[in-house]
Amino acid sequence: MTRVNSIIGFRPIPVTLLTVITYVSLFSALLFIDRQPPAVAKKGELDYWGVDIEEAWSDLEVLTRDFHPYNSRPNDDVRAYLLGRVQEILSRNGVSGFGNELQSSGYSGTVDLFDDGIPGKPGSNVTFVGAGSEDLTVYFEGTNIIVYIHGERPADELSPVLVSAHYDSVSTGYGATDDGAAVVSILQIIKSFTRPESQGGKRPKRGLVALLNNGEEDFLNGARAFAMHPVAKLPHSFLNLEGAGAGGRATLFRSTDAEVTKYYKRAKRPFGTIVSGDGFKAGLIRSGTDYSVFVENLGMRGLDVAFYQPRSRYHTTEDDARHSSKRSLWHMLGGSLATLRGMTDDTSKVFDSPNGSAGKGHNAVWFDLFGRAFSVLHLHTIFAFTITLIVVPFVVVLVAMWALGHFDKLYFFSNTAYIPPPPEHSIASRTTQGWRGVLRFPVAFVAASAGVVGMAFLINKINPMVVYASQYTVWTCFLSTWWIIAWVILRGADAVRPTALARGYGFLEQWLLWLVAMIGVAISIGKSHLGSGYWVLVFYSGFFTSAFISLLEMAALQKKSEVKIAVSGDDQAYPPEEHSQTGASGNISNRAANDDDDAGEHATEETPLFRGPNRPLSFAPHRNPRYDNGDHDSGDILVEEKDEAVYGGEQGWSKDLPSWTWILQFLATVPLQLVLAGSVALLLGNALAQTGADGSDMLTVLLGFGVFSIILLLPVAPFLHRITYHVTLFIFVIFVGTFIYNLAAPPFSPNARLKVYFQQTVDLQTGENNVHLVGHPDYIDRIVSKHIPSAKGKVDICQADKLKSGLRRCSWKGIAPRVVPQAPGGMPPEYGFSDWISYNVTKTGDGKATIKLRGRNTRACKLLFNKPLAKSPTLGNPIPGFPNTRELRLWSRDWERGWSVELTWEKEEDQEENKDSHSSAIVVCLWSDGNKVSDEIPALHEIRRYLPVWAIASKLADGLVEGSVPFMI
């Protein structure tokens, strides 16, 4: 039995080994999955899908040669390249099609290509109200590329599926991940779905609409323009491919419902959790994707799959092919192929309701396991499980405790005196000591958690941005803090006052803790329809199971009233007749009352610091009067004789407890919990660690790290007192290193550079130009004053930025831009500012005017009004019913064509005040091409050249340069 206990019993070596192996192996696996995308499929699998990863990578390299925002010449080059590639793919596969009019749902061909914006043909123009701003109106002319691959069944019978990506980049990023990888993936998807049968092709049951839209980065404009195209009325489901990071794995960002999410299960390497979707739903993630347009404007149901890390490279020059990989590309492409094949081969009517709409699905909860398995559940099912698990286990525990109490076997919360008691001169325990250990986990939990929270406040005070480049050292510091404090308390208490109930109390009390969390989960589901607490159910169920096992263990024990205590000293167990029942009763009650806390007499200088069974109460050589009846020497003191199955100084009755059940409890509470919580922790860590550059409160981020550090170690708490000191000593060394590092290390590095945001504004009337650099308030002043030559001693003001909350803006008179070509002669650019914008205002009536405006070398301008418009501006496809416009943004598919806009204000006599005031406005045009900054935007070139190596520039707004002219109406 001793040998068996040493192998599988609840002993230090088995517990330590299993704990260390489990945590190290699972953490290593989770980190590997998080950092390393899966390998590219072998040739056989690529041939099965009919795709070529080398060809896709070659396309990506072409697309990312230049910055290509909508308002740039390279954007036209990218569009021409993509159009040519689509035609090449269709021609190679023996199909062709080209049209701009959708006649019916029954086509004679198999593929139609729509060049939306071809010269001489009407394109998709759209006017809409800016999201979240009622006084903003946007007019946009689309230049999308649409490929409609027809299915076996017509669109009016089975709606086609939409797959979408945007081919524009931001003005400061090459767009390899945002959204080049998605664009080249769609090229390969078109290739796969149009293969002839001789090459392994298979015509889908439903059609597939492949959309390459232009203008997503500026306000989701491309998707809104697509909504005006006739093809947009056909699909009811979609897969949107995005990029909000720079490489890594593509995660399922969000989903409309469970029915459409199930298709993502077909992906060979699924990745994602509902936590990201709930982040959008709760408004915690403010950035948007085309997903919003497809759902809110077109009523579709679908998926949003996106790259999401590292955020420090997002919208910067490091979003290039060099910082991405073929592994990342294949992860998106492979998952998309499997998902779309499932969606297009589905012949059910789940997305085709009788009224012609996409119907409505059920809220979903989803998560992956090790990037290989994927679970999709209905939210209402999770809610039902939650309510059931709150009620049923609570009743089960109460019944089990009642039954154990009824049979006199409930050792928890007991201090039952042994009858007959040990002799007067024995130091053996006189009660079951069932209360011992009841407060250990609560005290350890509170103290260790307080230590982690305190550490978060300390780091936030001294070096809050260290998590930006070193999130793993922050994780390690928080984890080691909690472990050390909890271990010292739990192991120390076990050494001083050992008890066989410590593990059981730990499970029972954690189960109650997770019960409170379950109530919170139920409320979040019921009120807000948020399913991010799915992992709490696993924690709760595991700890209920383990707590119930601890209760079942007591069924193997003797009745408390039948426990006999043997003592040794003269190798004789005391006979019952030595103590009459009457004689014992007077002492039993007193001794029992004091047995658990050993506080029978007042402390003296000889009272020991620690007391416990089998320990003398003093280091002094004389007899203790408490156990001395005058007839015995100190050497005659009797101690409790315990079975070899009893560990250390634990209660003698624990010899009958099963020694192996801790393994079941460990398996119920540790592995799956670590996998689920660890996946969520890494997702949140990657998503939040670098948001400080966007103005996020770093204390909130650090506390989030702290909370999940606590959660990750809670499963091991009931076992901590059995883990040897060697582990904690090693962790302490790690803690010291990470603690010093987190307080002293530079927060940024060449691999995780702090983003600062650039824009230059020019008053074309006065010739005054200002450079604006926005960044983190702790660093932006230093960057501008110490590193930018043109700003040294010339910074006019640094103050809180109005556009980016939490950040600080520094402005100074910079080097004049040359974004508009000038006549030769070497004149300073300031002399040509007046030619950048031309406009003409004609008053057509009281409160009415027509303005014609045009910007040189641009196709993006805007009008800012001092008074809100009374009616919608008339231009393109106006949407009636949204007056009060104070800002009108204008986008044209043609260069320097300009716009003619009819405007209507309230009549002067209808205004209650400022009757004598005139309406005024400002014409602003944008220049967004950052490819020749040394010549055209030297201020940005200077910033890129002189920024410290740990900082990198990104765009502040749609235009890198804004030129403005005010006028009166």
Curated annotation (Swiss-Prot):
<keyword id="KW-0482">Metalloprotease</keyword>
<dbReference type="Pfam" id="PF22251">
    <property type="entry name" value="PFF1_TM"/>
</dbReference>
<feature type="binding site">
    <location>
        <position position="315"/>
    </location>
    <ligand>
        <name>Zn(2+) 2</name>
    </ligand>
</feature>
<feature type="glycosylation site" description="N-linked (GlcNAc...) asparagine">
    <location>
        <position position="355"/>
    </location>
</feature>
<feature type="active site" description="Proton acceptor">
    <location>
        <position position="216"/>
    </location>
</feature>
<keyword id="KW-0645">Protease</keyword>
<dbReference type="Pfam" id="PF04389">
    <property type="entry name" value="Peptidase_M28"/>
</dbReference>
<dbReference type="GO" id="GO:0046872">
    <property type="term" value="F:metal ion binding"/>
</dbReference>
<feature type="topological domain" description="Cytoplasmic">
    <location>
        <begin position="403"/>
        <end position="438"/>
    </location>
</feature>
<feature type="topological domain" description="Vacuolar">
    <location>
        <begin position="34"/>
        <end position="381"/>
    </location>
</feature>
<feature type="transmembrane region" description="Helical; Name=8">
    <location>
        <begin position="699"/>
        <end position="719"/>
    </location>
</feature>
<feature type="binding site">
    <location>
        <position position="242"/>
    </location>
    <ligand>
        <name>Zn(2+) 1</name>
    </ligand>
</feature>
<dbReference type="InterPro" id="IPR045175">
    <property type="entry name" value="M28_fam"/>
</dbReference>
<feature type="topological domain" description="Cytoplasmic">
    <location>
        <begin position="1"/>
        <end position="12"/>
    </location>
</feature>
<keyword id="KW-0926">Vacuole</keyword>
<feature type="binding site">
    <location>
        <position position="166"/>
    </location>
    <ligand>
        <name>Zn(2+) 1</name>
    </ligand>
</feature>
<keyword id="KW-0479">Metal-binding</keyword>
<keyword id="KW-0325">Glycoprotein</keyword>
<comment type="function">
    <text>May be involved in vacuolar sorting and osmoregulation.</text>
</comment>
<dbReference type="InterPro" id="IPR053976">
    <property type="entry name" value="PFF1_TM"/>
</dbReference>
<feature type="site" description="Transition state stabilizer">
    <location>
        <position position="314"/>
    </location>
</feature>
<feature type="region of interest" description="Disordered">
    <location>
        <begin position="571"/>
        <end position="629"/>
    </location>
</feature>
<keyword id="KW-0378">Hydrolase</keyword>
<feature type="transmembrane region" description="Helical; Name=3">
    <location>
        <begin position="439"/>
        <end position="459"/>
    </location>
</feature>
<feature type="transmembrane region" description="Helical; Name=9">
    <location>
        <begin position="728"/>
        <end position="748"/>
    </location>
</feature>
<feature type="binding site">
    <location>
        <position position="178"/>
    </location>
    <ligand>
        <name>Zn(2+) 2</name>
    </ligand>
</feature>
<dbReference type="InterPro" id="IPR053975">
    <property type="entry name" value="PFF1_C"/>
</dbReference>
<keyword id="KW-1133">Transmembrane helix</keyword>
<dbReference type="InterPro" id="IPR007484">
    <property type="entry name" value="Peptidase_M28"/>
</dbReference>
<feature type="topological domain" description="Cytoplasmic">
    <location>
        <begin position="720"/>
        <end position="727"/>
    </location>
</feature>
<feature type="topological domain" description="Cytoplasmic">
    <location>
        <begin position="553"/>
        <end position="662"/>
    </location>
</feature>
<feature type="transmembrane region" description="Helical; Name=5">
    <location>
        <begin position="506"/>
        <end position="526"/>
    </location>
</feature>
<feature type="transmembrane region" description="Helical; Name=7">
    <location>
        <begin position="663"/>
        <end position="683"/>
    </location>
</feature>
<feature type="transmembrane region" description="Helical; Name=1">
    <location>
        <begin position="13"/>
        <end position="33"/>
    </location>
</feature>
<feature type="topological domain" description="Vacuolar">
    <location>
        <begin position="460"/>
        <end position="469"/>
    </location>
</feature>
<feature type="binding site">
    <location>
        <position position="217"/>
    </location>
    <ligand>
        <name>Zn(2+) 2</name>
    </ligand>
</feature>
<protein>
    <recommendedName>
        <fullName>Vacuolar membrane protease</fullName>
        <ecNumber>3.4.-.-</ecNumber>
    </recommendedName>
</protein>
<feature type="glycosylation site" description="N-linked (GlcNAc...) asparagine">
    <location>
        <position position="840"/>
    </location>
</feature>
<dbReference type="InterPro" id="IPR048024">
    <property type="entry name" value="Fxna-like_M28_dom"/>
</dbReference>
<feature type="topological domain" description="Vacuolar">
    <location>
        <begin position="684"/>
        <end position="698"/>
    </location>
</feature>
<comment type="similarity">
    <text>Belongs to the peptidase M28 family.</text>
</comment>
<dbReference type="Pfam" id="PF22250">
    <property type="entry name" value="PFF1_C"/>
</dbReference>
